Design a protein with these regions (language model features):
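Short phosphate-coordinating micro-motif centered on Lys-Gly-acidic
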Residues: 171
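Alpha-helical transmembrane segments of polytopic membrane proteins
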Residues: 9-14, 84, 304-307
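Cytoplasmic juxtamembrane interface segments
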Residues: 15-31, 176-187
């Protein structure tokens, strides 16, 4: 039985949170905040165990037929993806529980803000307005449904084995994050959510242009085919630069960092604790996978620029963190600085530097996640 369950381990880990997110909404609405919390926690815990069990093998992969146009839909958990995948789901699982008291307080605040004034009938009796309990139940249902979709978007991005699949997960991760900031952030939440959406979306579109250039040149979007193919020299550098810029926005590296302090400062704390420790580091993972692994020659040519960019990001983030008076913004700028270390490690073209960058992601995810809690 266990073996049969493990056959589709990664498929379950990625798609169960997406498929069961409507159920989280229904449970929240019908049975309340606590039930929705425990349901989300239990589901993510199960998925985390699947990911950890699958990572025991050196390389674990699953492939499924998809459209012929885009190649194969695959999920790959290897030595590079495993630390990222495990950290993302461990953090999501813990934060599902941490959300319970924090978001309950937030929903109560929102109810006071948004509670409609009682409407009076012509005879002077008040019509019943929405009760606090109903309001909290509805809000927690929506919150946990979005939380689950956000979690699976991050994991899917790390496990993808195909450029189009990577891009789809990349966007799936962005939309719930935008809604979570827009619904429950601190004011002016809508403007900050739009700014976050605009910045990260523009980054994603630039990334897609790089993907299309490579995919159309090779004739396949599958990582395995790209790895073996000779990409024509005239598109190599422009495609690599487009991918690096697109990922630089996700990394919040210097020059593309503007959105992070705002999104971080406004987002509800459990979401800030995912944005900074888990989500922005996915940009570094993608640099490893897409630039270091697939375009080694271009990577060697551009590495000096990555190093300079990394050092600039490191010092800028650190200096700006010292000037903030809001603790969440301090964390945001310190995260920008940490991403500079990752870029610096990736730019070093040495095994130690690359291993150090991956270790940095794990320690940053753990440390920053704990700081927020």
């Amino acid at each position: 039985e266990l073996e049969r369950l493990m056959e589709y381990a990664l498929l379950q880990a990625v798609f169960l949170p997406l498929l069961l997110s409507p159920l989280a909404y229904i449970i929240g609405r019908k049975f309340g905040h606590t039930a929705a919390t425990w349901f989300t926690f239990g589901l993510l815990l199960y998925c985390t165990i699947l990911v950890i069990t699958a990572s025991i093998d050196e390389t674990y992969e699953e492939h499924y037929p998809w459209t012929e146009l885009f190649g194969e839909f695959g999920l790959l958990l290897d030595g590079l993806a495993a630390p990222f995948a495990i950290m993302i789901y461990v953090l999501c699982t813990i934060l599902a529980l941490y959300s319970k008291p924090y978001m309950l307080h937030k929903f109560h605040e929102f109810f006071k803000e948004q509670a409609p004034k009682p409407v009076y009938q012509s005879d002077g009796t008040a019509l019943e307005s929405i009760s606090l309990e109903k309001f909290v139940n509805r809000q927690s249902g929506v919150y946990y449904a979005l939380f689950l979709v956000f979690s699976m978007g991050m994991l899917g991005t790390v496990l993808a084995t195909n450029l189009i699949e990577f891009y789809i997960f990349f966007e799936v991760m962005l939309i719930p994050a935008f809604l979570l900031v827009g619904f429950w952030g601190d004011r002016p939440r809508r403007r900050i959510a739009l700014m976050f959406f605009f910045w990260t979306h523009v980054g994603a579109v630039i990334l897609l242009l790089g993907f299309l250039a490579i995919g159309l040149d090779v004739g396949s979007f599958d990582f395995a085919d790209i790895n073996e193919a000779d990409i024509s020299a005239d598109i190599l550098v422009p495609a690599a630069v487009a991918i690096i810029i697109g990922l630089g926005v996700k990394l919040a590296a210097f020059g593309f960092h503007i959105w992070l302090p705002y999104a971080h400062g406004s987002a509800p704390t459990p979401i800030s604790a995912l944005l900074s420790p888990a989500m922005i580091g996915i940009g570094a993972y993608a640099l490893f996978r897409l630039i270091v692994e697939f375009l080694p020659q271009t990577y060697a040519d551009l590495s000096i620029w990555l190093t300079i960019w990394g050092v600039g990001t490191m010092f800028y983030g650190g200096a700006m963190a010292l000037m903030q008076d809001d603790i969440k913004r301090v964390f945001a700028y310190s995260s920008i600085s940490q991403m500079g270390y990752l870029l610096f490690g990736i730019g070093s073209i040495s095994t130690l530097g690359l291993a150090g960058a991956e270790m940095m992601y794990v320690s940053h995810a753990l440390g920053k996640g704990l700081l927020f809690m």
